[in-house]
């Protein structure tokens, strides 16, 4: 069994708290319609198992126009210690993909509680215009924001609240 580590982190301006976590962080890449092509290329180079899920194959398709239904909503490449997640861009034209905003840190956990503890610490000073609090989605728990340093954090939990 994996041993939890103890870290000291600041939450808010001057508050230090002790945190134990079993969360995993992996790179998360965003593509503009070519996620399947890119991730297939990475699989050919790195080996491993690749899972691709199209938006049109999920209940979420009703929330998007048909022209986005072939976009990848979830891609996952696992090869030994290599673990990369990705998706095609689904955001509005006001926030189009460009170099520099096509990556994120993907925080993966099992329960709402363990995600919420870290989410609430990291969101301090986060940008408000792209903030999504943790909420239930068809695939589990989801939330995202850009922190006060401009880094995008995406949270996903296996279980719903």
PLM regions with names:
Residues 2-23, 51-53, 73-78, 84-89, ...:
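Vicinal oxygen chelate
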Residues 19, 29-81, 142:
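Core segments of cupin and vicinal oxygen chelate
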